[in-house]
């Protein structure tokens, strides 16, 4: 029998020559080595970052859902008898969305926004769309990015809840300020999506006998389109991609205004929406063929 072979002819491994307790001490020494400790810290840091990313994705999803519900609510304003009631309800819904925004700001505190931007960009764009839609209904103008960011500045007390009133005399409360800034790209993409909602609002308002809104929307969309045209293909890819959709919305609103001017007296008001919807479908078919 060869000296390197054990009983039964099996070849002995090299570490079999070392006692079992020495092998265990070697493992303990390797696990406490500086290299292993460094990799353990890297693992903890990555796990923490991944968990934060998933929490932000969930918050962004909630913000998107609630913002869409606010937009659906605002579309009822064309047929509702009391506009202020719907605007008040929409403001209440947006306050709930801003509470989610506060959680996003708290998650991003001390972090690089650009590392987590992809997790929250969808929710931020949808929020911009909802806020700008409400602002247009109120003022017939476009809300600025500075105004949106001003609304996303929060002050919380020790418990982490938002505190809108200053602390009373004798109360020693530590207030913390949180800020969440909308990026220019998110603002532009949200405004571009707003044009589609304004186009739907235009068609719905005509169906309810409102002849003034289509012309106000048309003038507003022309100004927005001119602004986006200055950016053109020099801006981010996502923004230039939205330019075609914006042009489609503008052309549909302009066609509605043209029909109102030329044939408005011929067609009964309750049939105008049907005429516009048919024309819109024809335009979509022509664009898909071309």
Swiss-Prot record:
Keywords, sorted A to Z: Cytoplasm, Developmental protein, Differentiation, DNA-binding, Golgi apparatus, Isopeptide bond, Magnesium, Metal-binding, Nucleus, Spermatogenesis, Ubl conjugation
Domain of life of the source: Eukaryota
Comp. bias intervals (Basic and acidic residues): 16-28
Primary site of residence: cytoplasm
SUPFAM superfamilies from the UniProt entry: Translin
Ranges for region Interaction with C1D: 73-208
Binding site for Mg(2+): 129, 197
GO biological processes: cell differentiation; siRNA processing; spermatogenesis
Localization per Swiss-Prot or TrEMBL: Cytoplasm, Perinuclear region; Golgi apparatus; Nucleus
Cystine residue pairs: none
Tissue specificity statement from the Swiss-Prot or TrEMBL entry: Detected in cerebellum.
PTM note: Sumoylated with SUMO1.
Cross-link (Glycyl lysine isopeptide (Lys-Gly) (interchain with G-Cter in SUMO2)): 279
MF GO annotations: A2A adenosine receptor binding; metal ion binding; protein-containing complex binding; RNA binding; RNA endonuclease activity; sequence-specific DNA binding
Cited Pfam families: Translin
Gene3D superfamilies hit by this protein: Translin, domain 1, Translin, domain 2
Annotated family: Belongs to the translin family.
Complex and partners: Ring-shaped heterooctamer of six TSN and two TSNAX subunits. Interacts with GOLGA3, TSNAXIP1, SUN1 and AKAP9. Interacts with the homodimeric form of C1D following gamma-radiation. Interacts with TSN and C1D in a mutually exclusive manner.
Protein role: Acts in combination with TSN as an endonuclease involved in the activation of the RNA-induced silencing complex (RISC). Possible role in spermatogenesis.
Protein name per UniProt: Translin-associated protein X
Species of provenance: Rattus norvegicus (Rat)
């Amino acid at each position: 029998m060869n000296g390197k072979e054990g009983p039964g002819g099996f070849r002995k491994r090299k570490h079999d020559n070392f006692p079992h307790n020495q092998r265990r001490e070697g493992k303990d020494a390797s696990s406490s080595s500086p290299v292993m400790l460094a990799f353990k810290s890297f693992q903890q840091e990555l796990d923490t970052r991944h968990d934060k990313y998933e929490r932000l994705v969930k918050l962004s999803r909630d913000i998107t859902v609630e913002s869409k519900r606010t937009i659906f609510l605002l579309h009822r304003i064309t047929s509702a008898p009391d506009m202020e009631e719907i605007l008040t309800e929409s403001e209440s819904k947006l306050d709930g969305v801003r509470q989610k925004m506060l959680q996003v700001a708290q998650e991003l505190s001390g972090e690089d926004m650009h590392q987590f931007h992809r997790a929250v960009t969808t929710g931020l764009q949808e929020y911009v769309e909802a806020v700008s839609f409400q602002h247009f209904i109120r003022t017939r103008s476009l809300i600025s990015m500075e105004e949106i960011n001003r609304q996303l500045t929060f002050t919380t007390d020790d418990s982490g809840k938002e505190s809108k009133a200053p602390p009373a005399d004798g109360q020693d409360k530590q207030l913390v300020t949180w800020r969440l800034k909308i990026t220019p790209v998110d603002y532009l993409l949200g405004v571009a999506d707003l044009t589609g909602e304004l186009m739907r609002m235009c068609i719905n308002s005509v169906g309810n006998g409102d002849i003034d809104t289509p012309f106000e929307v048309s003038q507003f969309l022309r100004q927005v389109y001119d602004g986006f045209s200055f950016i053109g293909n020099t801006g981010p890819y996502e923004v230039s991609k939205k330019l075609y959709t914006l042009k489609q919305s503008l052309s549909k609103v302009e066609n509605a205004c043209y029909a109102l001017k030329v044939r408005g007296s011929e067609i009964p008001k309750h049939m105008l929406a049907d005429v516009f919807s048919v024309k819109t479908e024809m335009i979509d078919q022509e664009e898909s063929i071309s």
